[in-house]
Amino acid sequence: MEKTDHIFHYNNTLTLEAGDTLPGFQLKYTTLGKLNHERNNVVWICHALTGSSDFTGWWIDLFSEKGPFDPSKYFIICANMLGGCYGSTGPLSINPKNGKPYYHNFPVITNRDVVKTFDLLREELKINQIDVLIGGSLGGQQVIEWAIERPDVFKYIIPIATNAAHSPWGIAFNEAQRLAIEADPTWKENDARAGIEGLKAARAIGMISYRQYETFGKTQPEKTFDKLDHFRAATYQRYQGEKLANRFNAYTYYLLSKMMDSHNVGRSRGSVTLALKNVKAKALVVGIENDLLFPTSEQKFLADHLPDAKLEVMTSLYGHDGFLVEFEQLTQIIKQFFKKISNDVLAKHTHAPLNINA
């Protein structure tokens, strides 16, 4: 079964949470599978910070015949978030007001703005119910935000390695990365490659938070004792910076890191705990044991305060990045979650079991 790419155009003014507006926007989105007659067999994916709508590049194991979400049975969709650089409106897009790229003039956006655009796409596709909403890290923040904003839309949510409000620790890591971008003398230029050397340094800083002590010890050890320079860990960091710089831009990285910082579901809703009570979906909250950036205490908080939630914790050498690496663990956790629901339903003799591969 082949994936398909699409563009959603919204031609009306979009009012943003911070008070600014966008004179319309577009979202690139990727789909796999077909909508059923009831249009409710939908699995919607929210991608992470530097991700795209092409979930087959990073989560295909979950969306395969042997995975928990078989595309012959589900309609799977992922949209590149507003502010992104993979086909959706972002800082390198043309501002229709002046015919030039936005660059530094792209407005401040929040996760609340992003899920508003997702919801407009959902309405355009005439999808009234989403069976499963899943995402990790920044995408997991959007899962929580959207489930609060539109509680009647979602049946199940799976927020992974994420939180209800971004922590001072996480904000500090992001600010260190933005300082690296700002230190690049080209950053203030209006050019698509502005700040690109700073972006490389920012990515290297970020990698320290995405991984952990044991990750580097196991994957980047020195094989000799006589080296004085060009250590494997150092060259690995440079490699990661170069790799991101070849596919991303500093404007988007800066913008989306600010968006992550502003994540707080309690804003204008009384409190974080009050906001979480608004969620009606049954939740599978997944944490990663050695996650430095989103420690498991944050997922425990979510599970404790969402009305109907189960917490599962993965183990991974790769820390926060484990949600992009530990496919077998994640697959089994998701399958077992739905298997238990199916068994509970059978025990009550109310309706047929869910269509999940065991």
Predicted features along the sequence, with ranges:
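Catalytic-loop region of hydrolases
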Residues: 1-42
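N-terminal cap/lid subdomain of alpha/beta-hydrolase-fold enzymes
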Residues: 30-96
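Conserved acidic catalytic loop of the alpha/beta-hydrolase fold
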Residues: 101, 105, 112-132
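Conserved hydrolase catalytic core segment
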Residues: 129-168
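Alpha/beta-hydrolase-fold enzymes
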Residues: 153-155, 159-243
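Short alpha-helix in the alpha/beta-hydrolase fold that links the catalytic acid
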Residues: 268-272, 281, 295-304
